[in-house]
From Swiss-Prot:
Disulfide bonds: none annotated. Belongs to the peptidase T1A family. It comes from Methanothermobacter thermautotrophicus (strain ATCC 29096 / DSM 1053 / JCM 10044 / NBRC 100330 / Delta H). It is found in: Cytoplasm. The gene is psmA. Signal peptide: none annotated. SUPFAM superfamilies: N-terminal nucleophile aminohydrolases (Ntn hydrolases). The 20S proteasome core is composed of 14 alpha and 14 beta subunits that assemble into four stacked heptameric rings, resulting in a barrel-shaped structure. The two inner rings, each composed of seven catalytic beta subunits, are sandwiched by two outer rings, each composed of seven alpha subunits. The catalytic chamber with the active sites is on the inside of the barrel. Has a gated structure, the ends of the cylinder being occluded by the N-termini of the alpha-subunits. Is capped at one or both ends by the proteasome regulatory ATPase, PAN. PANTHER family: PROTEASOME SUBUNIT ALPHA/BETA. It comes from the Archaea. GO terms for biological process: proteasomal protein catabolic process; ubiquitin-dependent protein catabolic process. This is Proteasome subunit alpha. The formation of the proteasomal ATPase PAN-20S proteasome complex, via the docking of the C-termini of PAN into the intersubunit pockets in the alpha-rings, triggers opening of the gate for substrate entry. Interconversion between the open-gate and close-gate conformations leads to a dynamic regulation of the 20S proteasome proteolysis activity.
Length: 248
């Protein structure tokens, strides 16, 4: 990408630069790139969401850091970027999910919710007096059309993925996904792959306390956050596996 040389075109959100760029949107993307790494993986048995939530200080309570959110009983989201912006979008998403249940007496489809979130993000790139949301979301869930995984960025763009990552560790994580992803993975293999990607994205600084994992299984279409003991087991398996790889 070209250097962000604004020449004054970043003073208003609604003004394009001569080469067709909205600098405030690009600045919002930079906020996401500086955020902690979040990942999503789709398998034949469900969706896996994993985030790196290493505290910035030893005085921070790890449990107070929240980067994965339940939106509805069958949908979850992982975020990167400005936490307060992400929280505002999550609250809006939860409201849309409940409105759909009340109006149509059925759970909202994953793609419909993702599009509604992107519509809101796009509106904040088009009006004066507001700024773009400095956060990206990975939205995963299971509905009648199977397992779905979407990524939204600050511009309101929406892309569906088999596996994706956002945040500072995205390049390393995506490289790991490109090498190891398979359509035939079960849920445990998807968790293994996601943790491999987090390990690469954090340069090996992965511990049981530094990651958070949530799954939405295709069998029951229910969001579930993994308890600490399950996360510890998965991370210990990861570290043993990496030790063996280094020895070889």
């Amino acid at each position: 990408m070209q250097p962000l040389q604004s020449a004054g075109y970043d003073r208003a959100i609604t003004v394009f630069s001569p080469d067709g760029r909205l600098f405030q949107v690009e600045y919002a993307r930079e906020a996401v790139k500086r955020g902690t790494t979040s990942l999503g993986v789709k398998s034949k048995e469900g969706i896996v969401l994993v985030v790196d939530k290493r505290p910035t200080s030893k005085l921070v309570e790890p449990k107070s850091i929240e980067k994965i959110f339940q939106i509805d009983e069958h949908i979850g989201a992982a975020t990167s970027g400005l936490v307060a912006d992400a929280r505002a979008i999550i609250e809006k998403a939860r409201l849309e999910a409940q409105i759909n249940r009340i109006t149509y007496n059925e759970p909202i489809r994953v793609e419909s919710l993702a599009k509604k979130i992107c519509d809101m993000k796009q509106m904040y790139t088009q009006h004066g007096g507001v700024r773009p949301f400095g956060t990206a979301l990975i939205i995963g869930g299971v509905n009648g059309r199977g397992c779905r995984l979407f990524e939204t960025d600050p511009s309101g763009a929406l892309i569906e993925y088999k596996a994706t990552a956002i945040g500072a560790g995205r390049p390393a994580a995506m490289e790991e996904f490109e090498k190891k992803y398979s359509d035939d993975m079960n849920l445990n293999q998807a968790i293994e792959l996601a943790l491999d990607a987090v390990y690469e994205a954090t340069e090996g600084k992965t511990t049981p306390e530094s990651v958070e994992i949530a799954v939405i299984e295709a069998a029951d279409k229910k969001y579930r956050r993994l308890p600490d003991d399950e996360i510890r087991d998965h991370v210990e398996e990861l570290l043993i596996r990496k030790e063996k790889e280094e020895e070889e």
